[in-house]
Curated annotation (Swiss-Prot):
Cellular-component GO terms for this entry: peroxisome
Binding site for urate: T63, D64, F165, R182, V237, Q238, N257
The protein's enzyme class: oxidoreductase
Designated name of the protein: Uricase-2 isozyme 2
Family: Belongs to the uricase family.
Keyword match Oxidoreductase: yes
Pfam families tied to this protein: Uricase
Compartments it resides in: Peroxisome
Length: 301
């Protein structure tokens, strides 16, 4: 936040616009179509303290102006670009166009529209909604300094075997049985920060950050599942999270359990349903919450 000393108080302030939804369609050189849908949030750090303490709005960028800018800049983008590049583009505009703005924070969530295939062929203009979401946040200072973070939200992963949980603390409150055979499911949230520290250092390759996002998603999924024919055993969500994290240079991971509880039902006459690793009750409340961050001392993304 922009910090001031006002009337003997430390005063932090910022203002912005949230949940600006924009979709952009491009016609490709090959004649097909491409679409993105973004939810944009903007925060501006600026020299507008007078609007708070002296009823003077002359230094304020109206939040409605910020909203309009999102659509105007989307219109100006004649080529397909990544969510990271659009976040940087917006932030760069605000710090360069307005002398009052000292820093801009732009965060974007991309809705996962995926091209459909019909009869094994990619459709020219047909898309379906996927699940996991690509996120990005760009923080740009007046000096051109940059902090760029990308992420994944809602990456749901499940394997029906090759998981267990044994050897944990047992006391008078423990009811959970140990097992070396269970289903493992989670919804991954991941964040990673790039090492580019200025606007002038970011790669100019088209869709560079989209390619990196797809690489990270693939490594996370491949590490979780293991080889296709044999898989890989998971002794705990914690261990699997660590193995997924250490495949990257620097990353934060959050992996709550999505529980599939064994179903055993009986009455006075005997079993109605006897569990044999086959019938489960899915539930996500309450759930375990496992998270960690890992950063190599010698490397950055």
């Amino acid at each position: 936040m922009a910090k001031e000393i006002v009337g003997g108080f430390k005063f932090d302030q910022r203002h912005g616009k949230e949940r600006v939804r924009v979709a952009r369609v491009w016609k490709t050189k090959k004649g097909g179509y491409f679409i993105v849908e973004w939810r944009v949030g903007i925060s501006l750090l600026s020299d507008c303290v007078n609007s708070y303490v002296r009823d003077d709005n002359s230094d304020i960028v109206a939040t409605d102006t910020m909203k309009n800018t999102v659509y105007a800049k989307a219109k100006e983008c004649s080529e397909i670009l990544s969510v990271e590049d659009f976040a940087i583009l917006l932030a760069k505009h605000f710090i360069s166009f307005y002398k009052q703005v000292t820093a801009a924070i732009v965060n974007i969530v991309e809705k996962p529209w995926e091209r459909v295939s019909v009869d094994g062929q990619p459709h020219e203009h047909g898309f379906k909604l996927g699940s996991e979401r690509h996120t990005a946040e760009a923080i740009v200072q007046k000096s051109g300094a940059l902090q760029l973070t990308s992420g994944i939200e809602g990456l749901s992963l499940l394997k029906t075997t090759k998981s267990g949980f044994e050897g944990f603390i047992r006391d008078k409150y423990t009811a959970l049985p140990e097992t070396h055979e269970r289903m493992l499911a989670t919804e991954v949230t991941a964040l990673w920060r790039y090492s580019y520290e200025s606007l002038y250092s970011i790669p100019q390759k088209p869709l560079y950050f989209t390619d990196k996002y797809l690489e990270v998603k693939k490594v996370l999924a491949d590490t979780f599942f293991g080889p296709p024919n044999v898989g890989v055993y998971s002794p705990s969500v914690q261990n699997t999270l660590y193995l997924m994290a250490k495949a990257h240079s620097s990353i934060q991971l959050k992996m709550p359990n999505i529980h599939f509880l064994p179903v055993n039902i009986s009455n006075k006459d005997g079993p109605i349903v006897k569990f044999d690793d086959d019938v489960y009750f899915p539930t996500d409340e309450p759930h375990g919450s496992i998270q960690a961050s890992l950063s190599r001392l010698w490397s950055k993304l």
